[in-house]
Amino acid sequence: LKKNKKMIAHHVLFWLKADMTEEQKTAFRKSLDTLQFIDVVKFFHVGTPAPIERAVVDTSYTFSLLLVFEDLAAHDVYQVHPLHKAFLDEFRAFFDKVTIYDAH
């Protein structure tokens, strides 16, 4: 994936509520995985904190979602896409905290 000046990186960190069951976490992860099928997504990665122990590395989150879009217009399409909206509708109640970093 070669970067162009219009590309948008959309990095979302999720802190899930402490009382979530393993089944709920699995369902959450599976729902995140569906977001890769949104046609404007050029790059997709879901993960959990890597076992890196450095003072500057934050490993307190539960899941990381990294998406890359061709441009801001594609990002905007993603925001209103039915799969994204379904994910939010189903799982928003499980978020304890969400932090988003968007960069171009």
Residue ranges and their predicted role:
Residues 1-62, 70-77, 104:
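Short S/T/G/P-rich N-terminal loop/turn motif that feeds into the first structured element of a domain
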Residues 66-68, 72-98:
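C-terminal structural segments of small proteins and small subunits
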Residues 41-46, 90-102:
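Conserved short beta-strand edge segments in small beta-sheet-based binding/regulatory domains
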